């Protein structure tokens, strides 16, 4: 799953807060990825075309592949992509996947992804929530910044290392529980 690319869309849209949630409901068999932001949002016209790889709001290149790839990854597993956006309010992208499907791509290294987002965008806030069968873990950069007290930046490599380890340590018990680990 290309979570980093989707989250960077939020940053590029001026989001001050981006929420990334990954939910595994084994009984329903539907992993869900949701990225929601308070960025500038999209017009209804752009929102309707944004999953076209040749539709982009950028001027630097004429293609945008993050959302089209996420949509394709979801649909290959029997899932779907939903996008809600309002100008001046923000955007929410939700992708569902078929858990047991052979084409389900690995989630990837979410701890490094979230730590990297926090480190490279220290002036923005990110909330990462992992939920597995109703049990959740949340990493919130606002709480981390409060603990750091402004004396140490989220851009500090040692902070990024801590964030990655913190997410890994708290995610592992959720991801490895039960009869079939994710």
What is each stretch, according to the model?
Residues 69-79:
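Conserved glycine-/histidine-rich ATP-lid loop and adjacent helix of the Bergerat-fold HATPase_c
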Residues 89-91:
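Glycine-rich GHKL/ HATPase_c ATP-binding element in histidine kinases
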Residues 23-33:
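Short beta-strand-loop-beta element adjacent to the nucleotide/active-site pocket used for signaling
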Residues 83-87:
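A short beta-strand-to-loop motif within the catalytic HATPase_c
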Residues 42-53:
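Short conserved segment of the HATPase_c
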Residues 37:
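Acidic ATP/Mg2+-coordinating residue in the GHKL
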Residues 1-22, 73:
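Conserved ATP-binding N-box helix of the HATPase_c
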Residues 94-95:
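HATPase_c (GHKL) ATP-binding subdomain of two-component histidine kinases
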């Amino acid at each position: 799953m290309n979570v980093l690319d989707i989250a960077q869309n939020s940053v590029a849209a001026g989001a001050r807060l981006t929420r990334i949630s990954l939910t595994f409901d084994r009984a329903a068999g539907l992993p869900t990825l949701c990225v929601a932001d308070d960025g500038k949002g999209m017009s209804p016209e752009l929102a309707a075309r944004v999953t076209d790889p040749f539709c982009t709001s950028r001027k630097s290149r004429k293609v945008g592949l993050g959302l089209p790839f996420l949509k394709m990854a979801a649909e290959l597993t029997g899932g779907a992509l939903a996008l809600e956006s309002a100008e001046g309010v923000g955007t929410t992208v939700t992708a569902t996947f078929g858990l047991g499907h052979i084409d389900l791509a690995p989630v990837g290294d979410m701890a490094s992804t979230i730590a990297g987002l926090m480190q490279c965008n220290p002036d923005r806030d990110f909330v990462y929530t992992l939920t597995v069968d109703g049990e959740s873990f949340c990493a919130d950069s606002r709480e981390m910044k409060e603990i750091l007290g402004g004396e140490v930046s989220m851009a500090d490599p040692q902070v990024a290392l801590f964030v990655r380890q913190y997410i890994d340590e708290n995610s592992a018990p959720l991801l490895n529980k039960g009869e079939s680990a994710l």
